[in-house]
């Protein structure tokens, strides 16, 4: 902490200049700076320079919005959106420093760079606001809600320009709808607007109120020649004044040609599916060449013109849908056939097994019966042999 550290503090002090503390109008920034002073600085800087550093930080933040260039004059006010963007960027950089846990000279360098960087960001946002957002109306009177950085107060800023927003030429065909549009791009953002009033302006400069309300559009259906002429739209404010005035010069054209309508020989697609055969009339006293196959002259055939040409993409989607449906039907049918075939094969196998069982039992019974008959015959043969032996013995005696 030698002379080099003192030079860093001097460089930080050179950036100071009293200005409008625009970014400090946000409560989140104020709370973050208090936490930064009471928590972070006590652990990362000596106590003897702690207060001086924090005083310079507060002055540097207060200088946000001071534009040094002569061609850029700062109004000293921003809208809520610009202030939110600047606040988010400042808090993000401040958190990055506290998370880095820097100390001593390196901490002072990083803090100095961050303050200069955030000051440039705020100035760029302020310039962008003044060029693109502040008073975007090219005509009329617009009221914007701005935050004035000197006192951190919200006030209405009046953008006064010419009330006359020009004349619009409108052409409409007879029996069509007439639409008068009185909405401008900045009307939604302006404050203190009330009602739209539409007037019919006559040749003697007198006016007749046609409609009044919150809607910026006037629609008149089935216009005729009597609707041609001059109209006027006036947007009122809560101060009983006018915000915008728009004039309209309406011309009613003849109705569109009948050839643009659907010709009588056009048939629909349903009628095209069932074509009608036209047979030419035969003059009296003259027979057709062939009653079975009459030949018609090409001019006698009706001209078939489709009403609407089919969209190729829609046609392709329809075909794909049909193919998918047919594929699903085939898949379901194949599954059903497979299940039925499996059941049929299972039934056949079951019947075959049932037939094999009685045959095996019958063969076993026949074998046992043959064994019993053999035993019976053997026993009878033994009996006959015994009887013949006894008989021979009796004869000998």
UniProtKB/Swiss-Prot annotation:
It is a single-pass type I membrane protein. Residues 341-397 are cytoplasmic. Glycans are attached at residue 204. InterPro entries: Ig-like_dom_sf, IZUMO, Izumo-Ig, IZUMO1. Disulfide bonds join 22-149, 25-152, 135-159, 139-165, 182-233. Residues 271-292, 351-397 are annotated as: Disordered. Disruption phenotype: Mice are healthy but the males are sterile. They produce morphologically normal sperm that can bind to and penetrate the zona pellucida but that are incapable of fusing with eggs. Spermatozoa show impaired adhesion to the oolemma. Residues 22-319 are extracellular. Izumo is the name of a Japanese shrine to marriage. This is Izumo sperm-egg fusion protein 1.
